């Protein structure tokens, strides 16, 4: 597991010369939640108009996170897993080993994206990734995320500051689902959760991460120099 201090020391990208890639991908392994959150915020605060966007692929040790709309009563019982109150949208969720997390540090204006469009893009990337494994997944009206036969397999939550996003999405690969029984996932009582392993998929988190990354890269609009697509 990468130490929090190492992650927090990731340097913000300085203004970049022409030809710099529009997207930097960091594969971070299993990293503690709070240092990762602080590093995302620091990156977002320090970035300039020329800083390349980044996607961080990783896992977290067991942790519950409670978004800005979260209500503490959705933590049904104390099972010894830390609870962290954070600044993303949404309610309570669980992260743990075996769950793929992708954080999207994106300049929305530069790619001509609105917040709702980025949310839809993330959902579609998960749907496309699962389709590549032969699993049919879908959205659910009024309940952000990705579902298979009504059970949640992918969660998402964002924070946007000055037109720049951080946080992102989580996809259950072979994560232990037991901790979800101690919460109302995303604020929904009795919501079932599933993982890719339940459908006979043996790929590990790193392998699934590469498939998800391909889907995200395919769906993300290019960086437009003027900050918006040409008319």
UniProtKB/Swiss-Prot annotation:
Coarse class of the protein's main subcellular location: cytoplasm
Pfam families tied to this protein: LplA-B_cat (PF21948)
InterPro entries xrefs: aa-tRNA-synth_II/BPL/LPL, BPL_LPL_catalytic, Octanoyltransferase, Octanoyltransferase_CS
Pathway: Protein modification; protein lipoylation via endogenous pathway; protein N(6)-(lipoyl)lysine from octanoyl-[acyl-carrier-protein]: step 1/2
Gene Ontology biological-process entries: protein modification process
GO cellular component: cytoplasm
Enzyme class label: transferase
Active site positions, chain numbering: 186 (acyl-thioester intermediate)
Domain BPL/LPL catalytic: 49-224
SUPFAM superfamilies: Class II aaRS and biotin synthetases (SSF55681)
Keywords (A to Z) from UniProt: Acyltransferase, Cytoplasm, Transferase
Catalytic activity field: octanoyl-[ACP] + L-lysyl-[protein] = N(6)-octanoyl-L-lysyl-[protein] + holo-[ACP] + H(+)
Annotated substrate binding sites: 88-95, 155-157, 168-170
The keyword Acyltransferase belongs to this UniProt entry's keyword annotation: yes
Site residues, Lowers pKa of active site Cys: 152
Enzyme Commission number(s) of this protein: 2.3.1.181
Localization in the cell: Cytoplasm
Molecular-function annotations in GO: lipoyl(octanoyl) transferase activity
Functional description taken from the UniProt entry: Catalyzes the transfer of endogenously produced octanoic acid from octanoyl-acyl-carrier-protein onto the lipoyl domains of lipoate-dependent enzymes. Lipoyl-ACP can also act as a substrate although octanoyl-ACP is likely to be the physiological substrate.
PANTHER family in alphabetical order: LIPOYLTRANSFERASE 2, MITOCHONDRIAL-RELATED (PTHR10993:SF7), OCTANOYLTRANSFERASE (PTHR10993)
Note: In the reaction, the free carboxyl group of octanoic acid is attached via an amide linkage to the epsilon-amino group of a specific lysine residue of lipoyl domains of lipoate-dependent enzymes.
HAMAP family: LipB
Family: Belongs to the LipB family.
Record's protein name: Octanoyltransferase
